[in-house]
């Protein structure tokens, strides 16, 4: 997202419950529905969250989707198999009972994964996250390596014709051609989502494209976390506030 699309880092108001009336709701996962964890494979999803999202989806006549940087396979393993899903930043799609739609894993991703492992071997605290069609390098546990990790990702992206996706304390290499904004556009064309007003909830810079797409389609973005330059119109301070807002919305819509 270009800087010109981002408003300054000011305190944004909380979203009104009326925003959910008639909404097509797009929810990021990590840092939005569940707190960020030191290791991405250490995250867990509780039944209370799944039940809340299912209830909210029913209140919205099916207009709810999870839009995540995680792969569809991982989202399904975490318990979201009954929901409309967009994974790997909009490169994959799936809904309950249907096969995953998305590109095959490129040989270049395997080459990048090997390079990431070689880089991490003598740099403690780094973690490689293998995804179905991409690979991430996390430096939350070794922040001193962040600049080197970013430089390596840029070099490998140029070498293999891939896209660098930056997130919180991580870099990821993946094929181009999609982001969370394009995911919103694709999902809004589905019969079960059409007619809704898009509302995108997310915490990371990777969610900015989702905020922009929602706004362009007449909706709004909700930033989760501290104020920063953003295309979102509203803000919720933390994951607990997101869950409270969604629970209130489900009750009101019921």
Features from the language model and the residues they span:
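Non-catalytic pre-domain segments flanking phosphatase-related domains
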Residues: 1-29, 33-37, 48, 188-189, ...
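Mg2+-dependent phosphoryl-transfer enzymes with acidic/Ser/Thr/Gly-rich catalytic loops
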Residues: 2-9, 183-254
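The start of beta-strands in P-loop NTPase/AAA+ ATPase cores
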Residues: 23-25, 63, 83, 198
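Active-site phosphate-binding/coordination module
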Residues: 44-130
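Short, structured coil segments at secondary-structure junctions
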Residues: 79-82, 160, 216-217, 230-231
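Substrate-recognition "cap/lid" segment bordering the active-site pocket of phosphatases
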Residues: 88, 94-114, 165-195
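Short amphipathic alpha-helices in soluble, non-transmembrane regions
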Residues: 112-116, 148-157
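Charged, glycine-interspersed solvent-exposed loop segments at helix/strand-loop junctions
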Residues: 127-143, 162-174
């Amino acid at each position: 997202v270009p800087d010109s699309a981002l408003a300054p880092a000011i305190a944004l108001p909380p979203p009104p419950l009326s925003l959910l009336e008639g909404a097509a709701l797009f929810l990021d996962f990590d840092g939005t529905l569940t707190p960020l964890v030191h290791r991405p494979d250490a995250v867990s999803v509780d039944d209370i969250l799944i039940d809340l999202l299912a209830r909210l989806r029913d209140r919205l006549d099916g207009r709810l989707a999870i839009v995540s940087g995680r792969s569809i396979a991982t989202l399904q393993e975490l318990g979201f198999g009954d929901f409309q899903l967009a994974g790997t930043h909009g490169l994959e799609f799936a809904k309950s009972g249907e096969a995953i739609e998305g590109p095959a894993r490129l040989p270049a991703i395997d080459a990048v994964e090997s390079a990431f492992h070689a880089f991490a071997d003598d740099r403690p605290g780094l973690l490689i996250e293998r995804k179905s069609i991409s690979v991430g390098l996390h430096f939350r546990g070794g922040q001193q390596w962040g600049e080197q990790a970013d430089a390596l990702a840029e070099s490998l992206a140029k070498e293999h014709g891939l896209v660098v996706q930056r997130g919180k304390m991580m870099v990821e290499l993946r094929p181009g051609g999609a982001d969370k904004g394009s995911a919103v556009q694709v999902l809004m064309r589905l019969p079960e989502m059409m007619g809704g007003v898009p509302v995108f909830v997310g915490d990371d810079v990777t969610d900015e494209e989702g905020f922009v797409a929602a706004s362009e389609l007449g909706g709004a973005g909700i930033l989760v976390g501290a104020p920063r330059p953003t295309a979102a119109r509203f803000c919720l301070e933390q994951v607990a506030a997101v869950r409270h807002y969604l629970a209130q919305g489900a009750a009101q819509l019921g």
